[in-house]
């Protein structure tokens, strides 16, 4: 088990995070660029010295500044996998995988045998084991990098955006393979990604980092069903409103007021699916609650649907069909009315 309490200060970031990862578990770290995800991995490896806290792996203290304990990076039982692979271009696949074992003192014959066996587990056999990275596809290079990270049987496996450099078709196959590998692993696994699909498909738990601090944690279902930051809401694809509830009335921070079906009191978060936002060029007839106007600020194609950002009070995004874009002339901008049924609004505590 990994027990990490990481406190460090850089010129651009102060990182203060604490989490645990059980053996065989996959913890997915998400967050916007510069939030501290990769910095967390570098701290676990030992490349960035802690200012406070401690890192303990299977009962062994890897770092504790208060006790003046710091195990060097090369002595830590950690496997690493990066988005750009970092394979040696002059070595074959089997030589790349065997390198870590040789560096730890394993004899050449045994290292090659273990490297060959690990590559075979990942579907690379025969002539491919003798190929150099330049003669391999992106997916094949990723399998070599995966084998290199696994062959030393690390107690902690760190994966930094491992699928980011792959094309869509290759990514699907490698994601499936990586999921199988991680499910068989006895290591504690930490995955850094900006891709929600990777986090949901591979992670047992998710930790969302913002500005060096943990802003949300839970299972993928818990995090995605109740986002607590604009970042997560954008990943999931829902509108997130924050404000103060008085019964079924929510005073939205930044301006605006909406009516909800569920009553609440005090600080509250509310989500609205863009598909639940109706739009029109004219004010809808009747006196339905949750109807307001705003200026169109963005029109973005998302697959076979279109997202329309309305800069009103509150600001909100609607999802419409391409035909609605033409019928309402949304590309021309201008004023647009938004309507949301109270029953389409989910409220929960922050």
Task: List PLM regions with ranges.
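ABC nucleotide-binding domain signature
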Residues: 28, 70-72, 76-86, 98, ...
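Helix-to-loop junction immediately C-terminal to a conserved catalytic motif
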Residues: 45
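ABC ATPase NBD Q-loop/coupling interface
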Residues: 54-76, 107
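Conserved hydrophobic segment flanking the Walker A/P-loop of ABC-type ATPase nucleotide-binding domains
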Residues: 19-23
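ABC ATPase nucleotide-binding domain helices that frame the ATP-binding cleft
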Residues: 38-41, 144
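ABC ATPase nucleotide-binding domains
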Residues: 77, 92-231
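The feature captures the beta-strand-to-loop junction immediately N-terminal to the Walker
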Residues: 30-32
């Amino acid at each position: 088990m990994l027990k990490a309490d990481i406190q460090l200060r850089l010129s651009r970031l102060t990182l203060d995070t604490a989490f645990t990862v059980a053996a065989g578990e996959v913890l997915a770290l998400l967050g916007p660029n510069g939030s501290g995800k990769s910095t967390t991995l570098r701290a676990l490896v030992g490349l960035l010295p802690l200012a406070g806290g401690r890192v303990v792996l299977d009962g062994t203290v890897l770092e504790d500044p208060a006790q003046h304990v710091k195990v060097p990076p090369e002595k830590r039982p950690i496997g690493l996998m990066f988005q750009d692979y970092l394979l040696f271009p002059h070595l074959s696949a089997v030589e790349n995988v065997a390198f870590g074992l040789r560096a730890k003192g394993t004899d050449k014959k045994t290292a090659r045998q273990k490297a060959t066996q690990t590559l075979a587990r990942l579907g690379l056999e025969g002539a491919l084991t003798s190929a150099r990275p330049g003669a391999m596809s992106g997916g094949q290079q990723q399998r070599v990098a995966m084998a290199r990270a696994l062959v030393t049987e690390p107690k902690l496996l760190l994966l930094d955006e491992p699928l980011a450099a792959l094309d869509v078709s290759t990514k699907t196959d490698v994601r499936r393979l990586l999921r199988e590998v991680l499910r068989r692993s006895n290591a504690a696994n930490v995955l850094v990604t900006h891709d929600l699909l990777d986090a949901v498909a591979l992670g047992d738990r998710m930790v969302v980092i913002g500005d060096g601090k943990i802003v949300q944690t839970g299972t993928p279902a818990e995090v995605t069903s109740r986002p607590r930051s604009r970042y997560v809401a954008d990943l999931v694809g829902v509108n997130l409103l924050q404000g103060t509830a008085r019964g079924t009335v929510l005073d939205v921070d930044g301006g605006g007021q909406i009516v909800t079906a569920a009553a609440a009191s005090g600080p509250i978060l509310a989500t609205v699916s863009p598909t639940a936002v109706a739009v029109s060029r004219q004010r809808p007839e009747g006196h339905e609650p949750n109807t307001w106007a705003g200026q169109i600020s963005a029109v973005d194609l998302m697959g076979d649907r279109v997202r329309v950002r309305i800069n009103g009070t509150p600001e909100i995004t609607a999802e419409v069909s391409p035909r609605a874009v033409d019928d309402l002339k949304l590309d021309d901008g201008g004023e647009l009315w938004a309507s949301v049924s109270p029953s389409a609004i989910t409220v929960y505590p922050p």
